[in-house]
Amino acid sequence: STLSSSSAASDVYKRQPVLIADTFSSLVWKVSLPDGTPAIVKGLKPIEDIADELRGADYLVWRNGRGAVRLLGRENNLMLLEYAGERMLSHIVAEHGDYQATEIAAELMAKLYAASEEPLPSALLPIRDRFAALFQRARDDQNAGCQTDYVHAAIIADQMMSNASELRGLHGDLHHENIMFSSRGWLVIDPVGLVGEVGFGAANMFYDPADRDDLCLDPRRIAQMADAFSRALDVDPRRLLDQAYAYGCLSAAWNADGEEEQRDLAIAAAIKQVRQTSY
């Protein structure tokens, strides 16, 4: 059990909770600890993806505050979390520009994905399992005689996973709204908890912010992000772009038959183009 020393998650939940978010996967309350420190209580809903949230808690325990919010306690489907403030990386994009936001993300990922002495939690999901929807969609397309981006991306993903260099614990869903500026500096929240090459841990950033297609489709931005992340993570930018392309096609497979699928595929195609022409 990882209940906090001061109080169980369920006890804290009774202290003046203010509901601040109601998402498809959880209810999120802001609470005060006995000493007045703000904290977050996250109540998980009984959804199909609850395993992601539970793995994410194991990831936070493993990080122990290094680049991520601290998990202060957990009880059944309640989590007591360090309060990470209200300022997101998306605010930096809006106020100071995308370049500065990318540099902040690169610096944080360098800390988050650095080699660790701590053994990886056994609960973390292997990256290949995370890509199941892409591999299935690629098989379906191939069986139908279609050579699609899904087929191409599945081949690339399979090759990279088969000859992976060092595996690290990954956040798994990093984007501009779960990188927060806290009293301890920039931290991540809401991890999924994966194990894979570091480039896969950066891939989702190329598709964000979600409302800024002008950025996500811009070849200069794609190249600038690849270069910044390549330096920070010590990864070949070509491999990073391949991972970002494959990840976008995975996201598109999850979002099949909707507007999001088309958005994901358009950005993935732009990433593939930059990879082929600039590197």
Please describe what each predicted stretch is.
Residues T2-S4, A8-Y13:
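Short, small-residue-biased leader/transition segments that mark boundaries at the very start
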Residues A114-G172, S182, R231:
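An alpha-helical support segment within catalytic cores of ATP-dependent transferases
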Residues V18-D22:
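Protein kinase glycine-rich loop
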Residues P46, L80-D98, A114-E117, A132-Q142, ...:
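A glycine-centered beta->alpha junction motif in the catalytic cores
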Residues S25-L33, I40-V41, L71, I155-F200:
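Active-site acidic catalytic loop and adjacent metal/ATP-binding pocket
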Residues A144, S251-Y279:
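ATP/Mg2+ or Mg2+-diphosphate-binding catalytic cores
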Residues T37-L80, R87-L112:
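A conserved alpha-helical element in kinase catalytic cores
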Residues F181-D227, R231-D234, D264-I267, K272, ...:
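Active-site Asp-x-Gly
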